[in-house]
Swiss-Prot record:
It is found in: Host nucleus. It comes from Fowl adenovirus A serotype 1 (strain CELO / Phelps). One of its GO terms (cellular component) is viral capsid. This is DNA-binding protein. SUPFAM superfamilies: Domain of early E2A DNA-binding protein, ADDBP, Zn-binding domains of ADDBP. Residues 24-33, 67-79 have a biased composition (Acidic residues). Homomultimerizes on viral ssDNA bound to pTP. Forms a initiation complex with viral polymerase, pTP and hosts NFIA and POU2F1/OCT1. Interacts with host SRCAP. Zn(2+) 2 binds at C305, C307, C359, C380. It holds the Pfam family Viral_DNA_Zn_bi. Residues 1-85 are annotated as: Disordered. Belongs to the adenoviridae E2A DNA-binding protein family. The C-terminal arm bridges DBP molecules together, thereby creating a chain. GO terms for molecular function: DNA binding; zinc ion binding.
Length: 441
């Protein structure tokens, strides 16, 4: 039972006092016990005459006294800094930034982490685009891939701000110095080695009753012929097929690409050049103040799908996203006035193709295409166009700047070829050590 301090009755008012929570807290804290490890409990009496006349100051002063004693006790217990690991400190800084962005987007972040495979990145990217850019429409991309890419670029910015140095490319993209348009020469695709691709005609046979066969007859100038077994098939001939120079003499069996190949292939080299030219001109229209030479020589490419993102291990097959030129829809509706007044419309009209990045090893179409692929190879539904890849970059940096009030580089690296990017026929699984001391038990 608490004792009433002496001379406390002299300060009581004759009016009835309303017992608020603040007053009750003062009465309970008349006697403060401070217990520290290794010390005995000490009781300190505080006279009302020694206190400030403001009850708020009295409560604040008592709280500060308790906090100071607890900090002194903790300093005696652990003389070393609790966050001596820079990785842990960086992860906590990154998590604080994630929490700030989630609160700005009215998004629940409890239980999330800053791991690259956490779903919080995709949620932040998708929520921001849906709230701030509801009018935005994708071009050949899937919403899952686009939202994930916005989250990847956002993760790259947050990792950079927190001082983290991941062993992978957090943005899942590279800046590629392509070299497709040399001066005074006819433009022609170059593979990821930086060498001119080789024209190698290819013929594909499809089942007439399959979806791929029907699409080939309707859209790709396929013809029905009899194969060497006497069966009717839809034949697609690609006379302008371009392959990596390593695949020039490769027969396609038992693997679709030769050892050391980058696995880049275009069924129509002219369409690939048109798509690359379009993406360059469109990027220059989006960034009118950018360095013209750098915008001409370099492009932003998606290199990691869901199969090999946030991993330093090789996968079976192709090691970066497959690039395919797609024909743009609606370019016939672009008028001459629009072409003369808008550089982006001029790019669409002049080169009506864009590059689309799909899974590193997409599932083969039924009917014989890619029959050298194994059914056990890892695959995903990644699909992202070059235009939407650029918009993902823009939205990610825009979101970070709007919430944090400052900009931060994404550190998108420049692509440089090395043998780790070559097509892999077999991948050795890493060893997971076993604790047992007897391998024959």
């Amino acid at each position: 039972m608490e004792r009433t301090p002496k001379r406390a009755h002299g300060f009581r008012s004759t009016k009835p006092v309303k017992r608020t929570a603040e007053v009750m807290m003062e009465e309970e804290e008349e006697e403060v016990e401070v217990v520290a490890p290794g010390r005995g409990a000490t009781r300190k009496k505080v006279s009302r005459r020694e206190e400030s006349p403001s009850p708020v100051r009295r409560v604040t002063r008592r709280r500060e006294t308790v906090v100071d004693d607890e900090e002194n006790a903790s300093d005696e217990e652990s003389p070393e800094a609790p966050l001596s690991d820079p990785v842990v400190y960086g992860a906590q800084r990154a998590m604080a930034t994630v929490a700030s962005i989630c609160e700005a987007l009215d998004l629940q972040w409890q239980g999330a982490s800053v791991r690259p495979d956490d779903s919080i990145w995709t949620k932040m990217g998708g929520t921001y685009v849906r709230k701030k850019h509801p009018e935005f429409r994708l071009t050949f991309s899937s919403y899952d891939s686009f939202n994930a890419q916005v989250g990847r670029f956002l993760a790259a910015v947050i990792y950079s701000r927190a001082g983290l140095e991941p062993k992978f490319v957090p943005g899942g993209a590279h800046v590629w110095r392509h070299g497709w348009f040399p001066a005074l020469q006819e433009p022609f695709p170059k593979c990821m080695h930086g060498v001119d691709m080789v024209t190698k005609p290819r013929t594909v046979e499809l089942n007439p009753s399959s979806e791929a066969g029907k699409r080939a007859l309707a859209e790709q100038n396929g013809v029905i012929e009899k194969n060497r077994f006497g069966r009717q098939v839809v034949v697609l001939r690609f006379d302008a097929n371009a392959v990596c120079y390593k695949d020039q003499e490769h027969s396609g069996f038992p693997h679709p690409h030769a050892h050391g190949s980058c696995a880049m292939v275009f069924s129509d080299a002219a369409k690939a050049v048109s798509a690359m030219r379009h993406d360059i001109d469109w990027t220059k229209a989006l960034y009118p103040n950018a360095d013209k030479r750098r915008a001409e020589e370099c492009v932003l490419i998606s290199t990691n799908c869901n199969c090999n993102y946030a991993s330093d291990r090789a996968i079976s097959g192709r090691q970066f996203c497959k690039m395919t030129p797609y024909k743009l829809n609606g370019t016939d509706d672009i008028t001459r006035d629009m072409v003369e007044s808008r550089p982006d419309m001029k790019a669409h009209k002049k080169n009506p193709h864009t590059m689309v990045f799909t899974c590193c090893n997409p599932q083969a179409a039924s009917g014989g295409a890619g029959r050298g692929l194994k059914k056990t190879e890892k695959t995903c539904a990644w699909r992202l166009s070059a235009m939407d890849l650029r918009y993902a970059y823009v939205f990610a940096t825009e979101l970070f700047t709007a919430v944090m009030g400052s900009s931060e580089p994404t550190h998108v690296p420049e692509f440089r070829w090395n043998e780790s990017y070559a097509f892999k026929t077999e991948v050795l699984a890493p060893v997971s050590p076993i604790a047992s001391d007897d391998p024959f038990a």
